[in-house]
Amino acid sequence: MATKKEEVKFEDNLAELENIVRKLESGDVALEDAIAEFQKGMKISETLKKTLNEAEQTLVKIVGKDDNESEFSAEQKEY
């Protein structure tokens, strides 16, 4: 059985991180709350990064099956 943490969708985590960023950018947060929100945001960010890395590896495996395609890396593409 999946834990509650595992059931949170990527999009939900991204939306939560965006809300945290908005709160912190507003400047209307007490220092202690800002630190707590920042820590929460960092944890969410790591989860998102892990999910994206796993998705990238899956795509690399899929694309790698076709001899006409080559492996790619997120570091190679600047956004």
UniProtKB/Swiss-Prot annotation:
Location (main, coarse): cytoplasm
Catalytic activity: Exonucleolytic cleavage in either 5'- to 3'- or 3'- to 5'-direction to yield nucleoside 5'-phosphates
One Gene Ontology molecular-function label: exodeoxyribonuclease VII activity
Keyword entries, A-Z: Cytoplasm, Exonuclease, Hydrolase, Nuclease
Gene Ontology biological process terms, A to Z: DNA catabolic process
Cellular compartments per GO CC: cytosol; exodeoxyribonuclease VII complex
Protein EC: 3.1.11.6
Highest taxon above the source species: Bacteria
Enzyme class: hydrolase
Xref: InterPro entries: Exonuc_VII_S, Exonuc_VII_ssu_sf
Quaternary context: Heterooligomer composed of large and small subunits.
Protein role: Bidirectionally degrades single-stranded DNA into large acid-insoluble oligonucleotides, which are then degraded further into small acid-soluble oligonucleotides.
Similarity comment text for this entry: Belongs to the XseB family.
Protein name: Exodeoxyribonuclease 7 small subunit
Gene giving rise to this polypeptide: xseB
